[in-house]
């Protein structure tokens, strides 16, 4: 005797009942999630207000300590110094706390993104975003090496040059946005290494608008060769800095949100000093580019405003990069000599 054929509608109804039960569980989970989210928002506001109040009181205390310090007896100086050190340590703790709290965007992020909260709430999310930023820099650096080599040795076309300069504009614009988000999330990027990306964005934009002509052709090969060298040095820096940062983070000597930079910082002194000749050569090449452009601007046949407008950013990049790197090297030598004298 054959069994009755299955009832398709009955199966559908039974599946629907299962879905209904699951949906009720989802609704309850979502309700709890929204309650926790409201609690989290209140905690964030309370924590932010408490930190703001305590930072204000710390500033007032620091002013009082500064005023009374000259009149303190010698036996009280050690206690005053200890108090000052504790206050500085407290400021560092506040910096770490604020990395997990919503904050107002700076002017640049407000102009680009509006008043969107870009603070990531977990260590995993922060580290994943930082790691993705580092990979983005690495991949784009390799692409820029290939394209600059192609434009320099294989193709001599203003169209491909324009595409290369457009890529540079997009790359530096993207870096400035991502770095601003990382700063909001606790990355400690030094001021110049952020600002020089804005200068590079402006420079690449002017290069993009420079029309083909005698002045452009005189500077073209020099610029493409410089771009190739600069991308190569950036690749070297990423490769060696990432390994050095990994070791220092494992030893607890660097912050988890520290980034690779296109320059030299004090933490690179151990193991990365071999990069200094490459960096200084690149800095002086920027100066050479600026001087070349200023000489071209004096040519009677020069009619393009882009010549001078490219020369000034190259000069600014040289001054900023050279003196920032030189200051780090000088401070490191000074601290080493001071340490040797103590020994």
UniProtKB/Swiss-Prot annotation:
- Name its cellular compartments: Cell membrane; Nucleus envelope; Nucleus inner membrane; Endoplasmic reticulum
Q: Name one GO molecular function term.
A: monoatomic ion channel activity
Q: Where are the transmembrane segments?
A: 136-156, 163-183, 191-211, 223-240, 274-294, 306-326
What is the superkingdom listed in this entry's lineage? Eukaryota
**Segments in the Cytoplasmic topological domain:** 1-135, 184-190, 241-273, 327-343
Positions with a binding annotation for CoA = 130, 187-188, 237, 240-241, 283, 332
Entry's Gene Ontology cellular component terms:
endoplasmic reticulum; nuclear inner membrane; plasma membrane
* Key word Transport present: yes
User: How is expression of this protein distributed across tissues?
Assistant: Widely expressed, with higher expression in the heart, kidneys, colon and sensory neurons of the dorsal root ganglia. Expressed in nociceptors. Highly expressed in white adipose tissue (at protein level). Highly expressed in brown adipose tissue and expressed at low levels in liver.
Q: Which UniProt keywords apply?
A: Cell membrane, Endoplasmic reticulum, Ion channel, Ion transport, Membrane, Nucleus, Transmembrane, Transmembrane helix, Transport
Q: Which residues lie on this side of the membrane: Extracellular?
A: 157-162, 212-222, 295-305
Query: Disrupted gene: resulting phenotype?
Result: Embryonic lethality. Conditional knockout in nociceptors decreases the mechanosensitivity of nociceptors and reduces behavioral responses to painful mechanical stimuli but not to thermal or touch stimuli. Adipocyte-specific knockout induces a lipodystrophy syndrome with insulin resistance and metabolic defects. Conditional knockout in embryonic fibroblasts increases Zika infection in embryonic fibroblasts infected with Zika virus.
* Membrane topology of the entry: Multi-pass membrane protein
What InterPro entries is this protein classified in? TMEM120A/B (IPR012926)
Self-association state and partner proteins as the record states: Homodimer. Forms heterooligomer with TMEM120B. Interacts with PKD2; TMEM120A inhibits PKD2 channel activity through the physical association of PKD2 with TMEM120A.
Role noted for this protein: Multifunctional protein involved in mechanosensation, and plays an essential role in lipid metabolism and adipocyte differentiation. May function as a potential ion channel involved in sensing mechanical stimuli. Mediates the mechanosensitivity of the PKD2-TMEM120A channel complex through direct physical interaction. TMEM120A seems to affect mechanosensation by inhibiting PIEZO2 channels, possibly by altering cellular lipid content.
Q: Which family does it belong to?
A: Belongs to the TMEM120 family.
Q: What is this protein called?
A: Transmembrane protein 120A
Give the species: Mus musculus (Mouse)
Lineage, opening ranks: Eukaryota, Metazoa, Chordata, Craniata, Vertebrata
């Amino acid at each position: 005797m054959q069994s009755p054929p299955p009832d398709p509608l009955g199966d559908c109804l039974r599946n629907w009942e299962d879905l209904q039960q699951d949906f009720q569980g989802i609704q309850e989970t979502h309700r709890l999630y929204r309650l926790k989210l409201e609690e989290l928002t209140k905690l964030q506001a309370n924590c932010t207000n408490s930190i703001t109040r305590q930072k204000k009181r710390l500033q007032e205390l620091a002013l009082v300590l500064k005023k009374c310090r000259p009149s303190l007896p010698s036996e009280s100086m050690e206690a005053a110094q200890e108090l000052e050190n504790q206050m500085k340590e407290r400021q560092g703790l506040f910096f770490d706390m604020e990395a997990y709290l919503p904050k107002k965007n700076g002017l640049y992020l407000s102009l680009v993104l509006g008043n969107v909260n870009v603070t990531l709430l977990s260590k995993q999310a922060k580290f994943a975003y930082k790691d993705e930023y580092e990979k983005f820099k690495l991949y784009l650096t390799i692409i820029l090496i290939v394209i600059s080599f192609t434009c320099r040795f294989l193709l001599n076309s203003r169209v491909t040059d324009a595409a290369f300069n457009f890529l540079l504009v997009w790359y530096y614009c993207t870096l400035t946005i991502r770095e601003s988000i990382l700063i909001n999330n606790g990355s400690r990027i030094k001021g110049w290494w952020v600002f020089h990306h804005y200068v590079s964005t402006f420079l690449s934009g002017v290069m993009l608008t420079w029309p083909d002509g005698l002045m452009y052709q005189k500077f073209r090969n020099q610029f493409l060769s410089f771009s190739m060298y600069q991308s190569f040095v950036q690749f070297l820096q990423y490769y060696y800095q990432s390994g050095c940062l990994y070791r220092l983070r494992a030893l607890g000597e660097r912050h988890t949100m520290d980034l690779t930079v296109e320059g030299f910082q004090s933490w690179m002194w151990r193991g990365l000093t071999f990069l200094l000749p490459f960096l200084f050569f690149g800095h002086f090449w920027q100066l050479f580019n600026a001087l070349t452009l200023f000489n071209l601007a004096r040519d009677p046949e020069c009619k393009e405003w882009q010549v001078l407008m490219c020369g000034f950013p190259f000069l600014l990049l040289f001054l900023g990069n050279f003196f920032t790197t030189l200051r780090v090297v000088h401070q490191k030598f000074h601290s080493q000599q001071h340490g040797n004298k103590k020994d």
